[in-house]
């Protein structure tokens, strides 16, 4: 991938975005028919009701095979529908919609993951693996992350094929395993072992970005331009232990919890980069009152000044803003002890960090040692494959891709036709996505889901995950028009 500085990225982004801002009134976009919607809903339901968790009950292969059957039944050539992977239970599906004839244009890849995080029936008001429509929402594990986009893109590929669409370049859809965790049977494996199947001019990854709503008001359309680095750390306290009837003054559990209290009270330093600065500049124009004033203050005041610090503190009360300002680290799992009547000899916590670009996992590991301030604690790095090591990698961030007009012009035009007047702005993704593997392989990746969600209704990975029905229909219309725009003809 061509490396560019953030200012160059934003300058280049300004051209297509400004062109769209002054364009004439949008003409009506083609929309999905009732039959198209019915098929898309059926596919969505089917995917939600196939458990694709990384558990003994889950199977990504079952979901991939179900979609493979749909493509083959629709008439896609078998040589263009690939079910493959190193793990029999975690097979990926790669489908190629071929160009009408010889072409010099490289393909476009739409990258989606099929796996979802575990959900317990006891935690939900509905069965997480049953597709439930209620009060204008679809409920089920994966309705936000990210089977809605899986289903929308599968149905769009099928619709275009049914309509006899003839693109000028190949369009590729990859439905992958192990994005939510595992041992790299998914996107990383495809890039390393089958580059020929997924090689592309650029990638659209719907696992990031989307439309932010505030009580029904359209605020901004986010397009991922970079992302934080995901890192896990194992914090361990040890002790000789003993009989619980004779407590010791030192205690592994107490020492670990005291250290975690320090972490809970700590805020990593406030930071902005050019992507987040542009994001808050655009957002300040949409916000009102104190929120807008605080955004303008953090942009104008020198970092660390009283004005900037006070504004950042107020904005940080909103988790989505806070995570755009700094590295975040939070305890996510605890384990301790071996018997109810014995003092714990070991207490461990997993601390999950999302690292602001410009900092490495090893730098944060060393910072955690200082924050916890207890030489008796061990702070180790946990790799994505679960390997625990004393030191961490030095990977600092996903390199932002060079902006491509053929991506941003149709993306902006179609988005603003569906959500009139919404500003389209580059953002930093606070989660982690499979885009990193393609970025490291030199393939530009952009994150955009075309899903509209209320800021306070982000339920991905959480209880009662749900998606507004209308948001799903709009994503169908977006992908249909976007695929035709980037595919040509």
Regions picked out by a protein language model, each given a short descriptive name:
Residues 45-53, 68-77, 155-162, 192-199, ...:
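Sec-exported extracytoplasmic/periplasmic mature domains
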